[in-house]
Protein backbone atom coordinates (compact mmCIF):
# COMPACT_ATOMS: atom_id res chain seq x y z
CA UNK A 1 0.00 0.00 0.00
CA UNK A 2 2.80 2.40 0.91
CA UNK A 3 4.32 1.82 -2.53
CA UNK A 4 1.05 2.72 -4.24
CA UNK A 5 0.74 5.89 -2.17
CA UNK A 6 4.25 6.90 -3.14
CA UNK A 7 3.44 6.33 -6.81
CA UNK A 8 0.25 8.41 -6.49
CA UNK A 9 2.19 11.20 -4.77
CA UNK A 10 4.79 11.16 -7.53
CA UNK A 11 2.09 11.33 -10.20
CA UNK A 12 0.36 14.18 -8.34
CA UNK A 13 3.69 16.01 -8.08
CA UNK A 14 4.31 15.59 -11.81
CA UNK A 15 0.77 16.79 -12.61
CA UNK A 16 1.27 19.89 -10.45
CA UNK A 17 4.58 20.66 -12.17
CA UNK A 18 3.03 20.12 -15.60
CA UNK A 19 0.08 22.35 -14.70
CA UNK A 20 2.45 25.06 -13.47
CA UNK A 21 4.51 24.89 -16.66
CA UNK A 22 1.34 25.06 -18.75
CA UNK A 23 0.18 28.15 -16.84
CA UNK A 24 3.56 29.81 -17.36
CA UNK A 25 3.45 29.02 -21.08
CA UNK A 26 -0.05 30.50 -21.40
CA UNK A 27 1.07 33.59 -19.48
CA UNK A 28 4.16 34.02 -21.67
CA UNK A 29 2.08 33.69 -24.83
CA UNK A 30 -0.42 36.24 -23.53
CA UNK A 31 2.38 38.71 -22.81
CA UNK A 32 3.77 38.10 -26.30
CA UNK A 33 0.39 38.84 -27.86
CA UNK A 34 0.16 42.09 -25.94
CA UNK A 35 3.76 43.16 -26.46
CA UNK A 36 4.45 42.43 -30.13
CA UNK A 37 1.51 44.36 -31.64
CA UNK A 38 2.25 47.24 -29.30
CA UNK A 39 5.83 47.39 -30.49
CA UNK A 40 4.70 47.25 -34.11
CA UNK A 41 2.22 50.06 -33.60
CA UNK A 42 4.76 52.26 -31.86
CA UNK A 43 7.84 51.55 -33.99
CA UNK A 44 7.02 54.56 -36.13
CA UNK A 45 4.07 55.90 -34.19
CA UNK A 46 0.44 55.63 -35.23
CA UNK A 47 0.56 54.97 -38.98
CA UNK A 48 -2.63 56.92 -39.59
CA UNK A 49 -0.80 60.07 -38.50
CA UNK A 50 1.92 59.84 -41.12
CA UNK A 51 2.15 61.91 -44.26
CA UNK A 52 2.66 59.98 -47.47
CA UNK A 53 5.89 61.84 -48.12
CA UNK A 54 7.60 58.68 -49.28
CA UNK A 55 5.48 58.10 -52.37
CA UNK A 56 7.49 57.05 -55.35
CA UNK A 57 9.08 59.57 -57.67
CA UNK A 58 10.54 59.06 -61.10
CA UNK A 59 13.14 61.83 -61.11
CA UNK A 60 16.57 61.21 -59.62
CA UNK A 61 17.29 62.90 -56.31
CA UNK A 62 20.33 64.70 -57.70
CA UNK A 63 18.22 66.42 -60.33
CA UNK A 64 15.46 67.68 -58.05
CA UNK A 65 15.22 71.25 -56.87
CA UNK A 66 15.77 72.30 -53.29
CA UNK A 67 14.03 75.30 -51.79
CA UNK A 68 15.73 77.85 -49.58
CA UNK A 69 15.37 77.44 -45.84
CA UNK A 70 13.71 80.22 -43.90
CA UNK A 71 16.87 80.66 -41.81
CA UNK A 72 18.87 81.87 -44.84
CA UNK A 73 20.68 78.60 -45.51
CA UNK A 74 20.55 76.61 -48.71
CA UNK A 75 22.39 73.44 -49.70
CA UNK A 76 22.55 72.14 -53.24
CA UNK A 77 24.39 69.28 -54.87
CA UNK A 78 27.02 69.82 -57.54
CA UNK A 79 25.25 70.04 -60.88
CA UNK A 80 21.82 70.46 -59.29
CA UNK A 81 19.57 73.47 -58.83
CA UNK A 82 17.81 75.13 -55.91
CA UNK A 83 15.29 77.91 -55.75
CA UNK A 84 15.50 81.15 -53.78
CA UNK A 85 12.35 83.22 -53.15
CA UNK A 86 11.40 86.18 -55.31
CA UNK A 87 13.69 89.16 -54.80
CA UNK A 88 13.18 92.91 -54.92
CA UNK A 89 16.54 93.38 -56.62
CA UNK A 90 18.90 91.23 -58.65
CA UNK A 91 20.67 88.19 -57.21
CA UNK A 92 24.46 88.03 -57.00
CA UNK A 93 26.82 85.23 -55.99
CA UNK A 94 29.97 85.96 -54.00
CA UNK A 95 31.75 83.10 -55.79
CA UNK A 96 30.42 81.91 -59.13
CA UNK A 97 32.98 79.10 -59.17
CA UNK A 98 30.98 77.56 -56.30
CA UNK A 99 27.39 78.53 -57.14
CA UNK A 100 25.69 80.57 -59.82
CA UNK A 101 22.31 82.32 -59.60
CA UNK A 102 20.06 83.70 -62.32
CA UNK A 103 17.58 86.56 -62.23
CA UNK A 104 14.74 84.30 -61.08
CA UNK A 105 16.70 83.11 -58.04
CA UNK A 106 17.56 79.68 -59.41
CA UNK A 107 20.85 78.55 -57.87
CA UNK A 108 23.09 76.06 -59.65
CA UNK A 109 25.75 74.19 -57.70
CA UNK A 110 29.03 74.37 -59.61
CA UNK A 111 31.56 72.78 -57.28
CA UNK A 112 31.88 71.82 -53.63
CA UNK A 113 32.27 74.82 -51.36
CA UNK A 114 30.46 77.69 -49.68
CA UNK A 115 29.51 81.16 -50.79
CA UNK A 116 26.91 83.86 -50.24
CA UNK A 117 24.09 84.86 -52.53
CA UNK A 118 22.30 88.15 -51.93
CA UNK A 119 19.70 90.40 -53.49
CA UNK A 120 21.07 93.40 -51.63
CA UNK A 121 18.69 92.92 -48.70
CA UNK A 122 18.77 89.23 -47.84
CA UNK A 123 21.90 87.10 -47.62
CA UNK A 124 21.80 83.35 -48.11
CA UNK A 125 24.59 81.05 -47.02
CA UNK A 126 25.03 78.56 -49.86
CA UNK A 127 26.65 75.15 -49.41
CA UNK A 128 27.40 73.11 -52.52
CA UNK A 129 27.73 69.44 -51.62
CA UNK A 130 29.73 66.71 -53.32
CA UNK A 131 28.16 63.25 -53.58
CA UNK A 132 30.46 60.24 -53.41
CA UNK A 133 29.32 56.68 -53.99
CA UNK A 134 31.21 54.12 -51.92
CA UNK A 135 30.73 50.38 -51.64
CA UNK A 136 28.42 50.59 -48.64
CA UNK A 137 26.41 53.66 -49.62
CA UNK A 138 26.36 57.34 -50.56
CA UNK A 139 28.21 60.16 -48.81
CA UNK A 140 27.49 63.88 -49.11
CA UNK A 141 30.53 65.92 -48.07
CA UNK A 142 31.75 62.87 -46.16
CA UNK A 143 28.47 62.29 -44.30
CA UNK A 144 26.77 58.93 -44.88
CA UNK A 145 23.23 59.66 -46.06
CA UNK A 146 20.56 56.98 -45.78
CA UNK A 147 16.95 57.78 -46.56
CA UNK A 148 14.29 56.93 -49.15
CA UNK A 149 16.57 58.06 -51.99
CA UNK A 150 19.90 56.67 -50.79
CA UNK A 151 20.11 53.01 -49.70
CA UNK A 152 22.87 50.95 -48.15
CA UNK A 153 24.19 47.70 -49.57
CA UNK A 154 22.51 44.64 -48.10
CA UNK A 155 25.82 43.27 -46.80
CA UNK A 156 26.84 46.43 -44.94
CA UNK A 157 27.06 45.18 -41.36
CA UNK A 158 29.03 47.55 -39.09
CA UNK A 159 27.10 46.91 -35.88
CA UNK A 160 26.65 49.78 -33.45
CA UNK A 161 29.67 51.91 -34.26
CA UNK A 162 32.02 52.65 -31.32
CA UNK A 163 31.91 56.40 -31.93
CA UNK A 164 28.11 56.29 -31.61
CA UNK A 165 28.19 54.16 -28.49
CA UNK A 166 30.81 56.33 -26.78
CA UNK A 167 29.03 59.58 -27.65
CA UNK A 168 25.72 58.25 -26.36
CA UNK A 169 27.32 57.13 -23.11
CA UNK A 170 28.55 60.68 -22.53
CA UNK A 171 25.11 62.03 -23.39
CA UNK A 172 23.41 59.57 -21.05
CA UNK A 173 25.83 60.38 -18.22
CA UNK A 174 25.19 64.10 -18.64
CA UNK A 175 21.43 63.55 -18.56
CA UNK A 176 21.79 61.45 -15.42
CA UNK A 177 23.48 64.38 -13.68
CA UNK A 178 20.25 66.29 -14.30
CA UNK A 179 18.21 63.47 -12.78
CA UNK A 180 17.09 62.14 -16.16
CA UNK A 181 17.22 58.62 -17.55
CA UNK A 182 18.19 58.29 -21.21
CA UNK A 183 19.00 54.79 -22.38
CA UNK A 184 19.21 52.82 -25.62
CA UNK A 185 15.85 51.41 -26.61
CA UNK A 186 17.04 50.24 -30.03
CA UNK A 187 20.18 50.74 -32.07
CA UNK A 188 21.80 48.73 -34.86
CA UNK A 189 19.67 46.56 -37.11
CA UNK A 190 21.05 44.56 -40.00
CA UNK A 191 19.39 44.20 -43.40
CA UNK A 192 17.79 40.84 -42.62
CA UNK A 193 16.17 42.12 -39.45
CA UNK A 194 14.77 45.14 -41.28
CA UNK A 195 13.22 42.75 -43.81
CA UNK A 196 11.22 41.18 -40.98
CA UNK A 197 10.15 44.54 -39.58
CA UNK A 198 9.10 45.95 -42.93
CA UNK A 199 7.25 42.79 -43.96
CA UNK A 200 5.36 42.81 -40.66
CA UNK A 201 4.16 46.34 -41.38
CA UNK A 202 3.22 45.42 -44.95
CA UNK A 203 1.19 42.48 -43.67
CA UNK A 204 -0.56 44.68 -41.12
CA UNK A 205 -1.15 47.84 -43.14
CA UNK A 206 -0.27 47.18 -46.78
CA UNK A 207 2.91 48.28 -48.54
CA UNK A 208 1.72 51.77 -49.45
CA UNK A 209 0.85 52.62 -45.86
CA UNK A 210 3.96 50.88 -44.53
CA UNK A 211 6.13 53.09 -46.73
CA UNK A 212 4.75 56.16 -44.98
CA UNK A 213 6.19 55.21 -41.59
CA UNK A 214 8.66 52.34 -41.97
CA UNK A 215 11.97 52.13 -43.80
CA UNK A 216 12.36 49.51 -46.47
CA UNK A 217 15.23 47.05 -46.07
CA UNK A 218 18.45 48.81 -47.00
CA UNK A 219 16.91 52.24 -46.48
CA UNK A 220 16.95 52.22 -42.67
CA UNK A 221 19.33 54.50 -40.79
CA UNK A 222 19.61 51.85 -38.12
CA UNK A 223 21.76 49.80 -40.50
CA UNK A 224 24.41 52.54 -40.42
CA UNK A 225 25.29 51.85 -36.80
CA UNK A 226 25.07 55.62 -36.25
CA UNK A 227 21.47 55.75 -35.03
CA UNK A 228 19.88 55.18 -31.64
CA UNK A 229 16.26 55.11 -30.55
CA UNK A 230 16.13 56.44 -27.00
CA UNK A 231 13.97 54.94 -24.29
CA UNK A 232 10.49 53.89 -25.42
CA UNK A 233 9.62 54.10 -29.09
CA UNK A 234 6.35 55.87 -28.44
CA UNK A 235 4.90 59.29 -29.21
CA UNK A 236 4.43 59.80 -25.47
CA UNK A 237 8.21 60.05 -25.12
CA UNK A 238 8.02 63.48 -26.74
CA UNK A 239 6.17 64.80 -23.69
CA UNK A 240 8.83 63.72 -21.20
CA UNK A 241 11.57 65.78 -19.59
CA UNK A 242 14.07 63.41 -21.19
CA UNK A 243 12.84 64.29 -24.69
CA UNK A 244 13.04 68.02 -23.98
CA UNK A 245 16.59 67.67 -22.65
CA UNK A 246 17.56 65.45 -25.58
CA UNK A 247 16.42 68.01 -28.15
CA UNK A 248 18.26 70.79 -26.34
CA UNK A 249 21.54 68.98 -25.70
CA UNK A 250 21.96 66.13 -28.21
CA UNK A 251 24.08 68.29 -30.54
CA UNK A 252 26.63 68.81 -27.76
CA UNK A 253 27.45 65.12 -28.14
CA UNK A 254 27.27 64.95 -31.94
CA UNK A 255 23.65 63.85 -32.39
CA UNK A 256 20.68 65.36 -34.19
CA UNK A 257 16.96 64.69 -33.90
CA UNK A 258 16.80 62.92 -37.24
CA UNK A 259 13.08 63.36 -37.95
CA UNK A 260 12.07 66.73 -36.44
CA UNK A 261 8.54 67.96 -35.96
CA UNK A 262 6.92 69.64 -38.97
CA UNK A 263 9.45 68.30 -41.49
CA UNK A 264 7.58 65.15 -42.53
CA UNK A 265 7.35 66.26 -46.15
CA UNK A 266 11.14 66.60 -46.28
CA UNK A 267 12.34 63.55 -44.35
CA UNK A 268 9.47 61.28 -45.38
CA UNK A 269 8.85 60.28 -41.77
CA UNK A 270 6.74 61.43 -38.88
CA UNK A 271 8.30 63.32 -35.98
CA UNK A 272 10.35 60.91 -33.90
CA UNK A 273 11.65 62.61 -30.74
CA UNK A 274 13.43 59.41 -29.70
CA UNK A 275 15.40 58.87 -32.93
CA UNK A 276 18.88 60.42 -32.92
CA UNK A 277 21.65 60.18 -35.50
CA UNK A 278 25.36 60.73 -34.90
CA UNK A 279 26.96 63.21 -37.33
CA UNK A 280 29.71 64.77 -35.20
CA UNK A 281 29.56 67.74 -32.84
CA UNK A 282 30.25 70.59 -35.27
CA UNK A 283 27.80 69.33 -37.88
CA UNK A 284 25.15 68.52 -35.28
CA UNK A 285 25.35 72.01 -33.78
CA UNK A 286 25.02 73.62 -37.20
CA UNK A 287 21.99 71.49 -38.08
CA UNK A 288 20.19 71.83 -34.76
CA UNK A 289 20.86 75.55 -34.30
CA UNK A 290 19.26 76.28 -37.68
CA UNK A 291 16.36 73.89 -37.27
CA UNK A 292 17.34 71.87 -40.32
CA UNK A 293 16.85 68.27 -41.32
CA UNK A 294 19.80 66.24 -42.57
CA UNK A 295 18.20 66.41 -46.02
CA UNK A 296 18.11 70.21 -45.95
CA UNK A 297 21.64 70.42 -44.61
CA UNK A 298 23.04 68.17 -47.34
CA UNK A 299 20.77 69.33 -50.17
CA UNK A 300 19.29 65.90 -50.89
CA UNK A 301 15.81 64.48 -51.40
CA UNK A 302 14.10 61.56 -49.68
CA UNK A 303 11.75 59.77 -52.07
CA UNK A 304 11.56 56.17 -53.17
CA UNK A 305 12.20 55.67 -56.88
CA UNK A 306 9.39 53.12 -57.24
CA UNK A 307 7.35 50.42 -55.52
CA UNK A 308 9.02 47.87 -53.30
CA UNK A 309 10.05 44.77 -55.22
CA UNK A 310 11.36 42.71 -52.34
Model regions: which residues?
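Extracytoplasmic cell-surface/polysaccharide-interacting catalytic and binding patches
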Residues: 2-67, 75, 120-310
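Well-ordered beta-strand positions in beta-sheet-rich domains
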Residues: 73, 98, 106, 123-125
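Solvent-exposed, conformationally flexible loop/turn segments
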Residues: 77-80
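Extracellular/lumenal glycan-associated surfaces
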Residues: 88, 114-122
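Glycine-centered loop/turn positions within well-structured domains
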Residues: 97, 115, 285
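Short, exposed beta-strand/loop patches in secreted or surface proteins that constitute
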Residues: 98-101, 108, 136-137
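Extracellular/luminal low-complexity segments enriched in Ser/Thr/Pro
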Residues: 105-115
Amino acid sequence: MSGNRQQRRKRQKYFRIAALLLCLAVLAFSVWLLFIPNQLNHRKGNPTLHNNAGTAGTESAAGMEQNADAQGFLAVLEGSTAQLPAADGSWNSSDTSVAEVDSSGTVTGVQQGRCQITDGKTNYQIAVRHLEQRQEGTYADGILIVNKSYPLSADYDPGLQPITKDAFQKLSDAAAQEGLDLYIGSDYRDYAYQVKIYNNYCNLYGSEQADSFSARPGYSEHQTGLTIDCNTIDDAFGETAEAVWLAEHCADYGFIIRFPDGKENITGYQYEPWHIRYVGVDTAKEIMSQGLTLEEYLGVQSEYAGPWEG
